[in-house]
Amino acid sequence: MPRYLSLVRVQENTIDMADADPGFEARMGALFEEITKAGVMLDTAGLRPTAESSRLTWSDGKVSVTDGPFTETKEVVGGYALLQCKDRAEAMEWSRRFLAVHPPHWTVGLEVREVEEMPGA
């Protein structure tokens, strides 16, 4: 069964958990319980701020390192979910449901990509 990586895209420093509506955490918990019981959710987590991260780049045969925060970047990956679904349509439906539990005044995006499986793995 194919796996899909859902990358949560946010504008860093624009989402404040204190700004969430009172039912947000309960809605998210219920969705996570449902998706886990369905055997779809393999792993998920939020990511620490870019101020605590580094970017490594390979160019001209050398590795360069840039420490965050990355002020030139509007959107960053704020979290991820690894899903195992029967097809892309199912991955998209779970992703739509994930977005729908968020407060309406937040802007959150998802990039859903199928994991390329290695032959023989």
Regions picked out by a protein language model, each given a short descriptive name:
Residues 1-121:
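Conserved, structured core segments of small domains
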